[in-house]
Every structure is written in structure tokens, then in C-alpha cells.
């Protein structure tokens, strides 16, 4: 539970200490497009010469705000395995509120690790809290 994590962090933070948090900024268009068909997301050659292809399929659940991701691995053109990742999506105003409700002061909110300003096109939500 996110609130339990925030409570543990707050209890371990020294007075004046900083809490850094990064989270994806949900991109609804990307999620919707990802539900339509399996898409190639990576292709590479391993050190031992195997050709690896990764295809992704996503399914977003509105009720739980979980994006269920499947990565289908192909090695040398043959299907090998599936890896699943369930990712809870936290929307910007939601996460801002959760941090404040749990006693954190948001000092900075960036759109990436380069400390660029957070905006509609930001891939990340990077927080510096106290």
C-alpha cells in the first residue's frame, strides 16, 4: 500500500531530510494504442550472437488503474517466453495529493531526471519532497 510506504519513509526521514520519488506520468494515448496490437519495442543481438526481439502488448484496467503489460520474447525468430509487468498508474494530481495528505511538502516536481519542468508531455514525475 502506497500510504504505508509513505509512512515508513516519513518516519525514517531526518528533520529537513529529502525524499526523492520518481514515477511514470501516465500517457493515455500510448496505453490505448498499446491495447490495439502487439508492437515491437526492442531488438538486439546478445554477446553470444542470439537475435532477440521483444514485442509488447498492454491492457489497462480503469477500475484498478493498473496497466497490465506483457513482453513476448523471441530468440532467433522463435517464440521463447512471456514476461508480465503489472504497473499501477498514478496520475499527476492524484500523486501530488497523496504526497501532501501523507505529510510531505513538494519542493520540486520535474518531468525527468534532467530536472526539466513537468508538463503535459513529461514521461516521468520526479519529486523532491521534504
What spans do the regions from the language model cover?
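C-terminal lobe and adjacent flexible extensions of AdoMet/dcAdoMet transferase-like proteins
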Residues: 86-130
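SAM-dependent methyltransferase
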Residues: 20-93
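A short glycine-rich, Lys/Arg-flanked "PGG" loop and its adjoining helix->strand segment in the class I
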Residues: 3-18
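Residues at alpha-helix caps and immediate loop-helix transition turns in enzyme cores, especially N-
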Residues: 1-2, 121
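A short hydrophobic/small-residue beta-strand
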Residues: 19-20, 106
Amino acid at each position: 500500500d502506497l500510504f504505508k510506504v509513505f509512512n515508513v519513509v516519513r518516519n525514517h526521514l531526518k528533520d529537513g531530510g529529502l525524499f526523492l520519488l520518481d514515477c511514470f506520468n501516465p500517457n493515455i494515448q500510448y496505453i490505448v494504442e498499446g491495447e490495439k496490437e502487439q508492437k515491437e519495442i526492442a531488438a538486439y543481438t546478445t554477446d553470444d550472437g542470439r537475435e532477440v526481439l521483444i514485442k509488447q502488448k498492454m491492457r489497462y484496467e480503469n477500475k484498478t488503474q493498473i496497466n497490465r503489460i506483457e513482453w513476448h520474447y523471441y530468440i532467433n525468430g522463435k517464440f521463447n517466453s512471456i514476461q508480465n509487468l503489472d504497473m499501477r498508474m498514478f496520475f499527476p494530481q492524484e500523486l501530488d495529493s497523496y504526497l501532501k495528505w501523507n505529510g510531505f511538502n513538494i519542493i520540486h516536481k520535474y518531468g525527468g531526471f534532467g530536472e526539466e519542468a513537468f508538463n503535459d508531455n513529461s514521461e516521468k514525475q520526479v519529486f523532491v519532497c521534504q
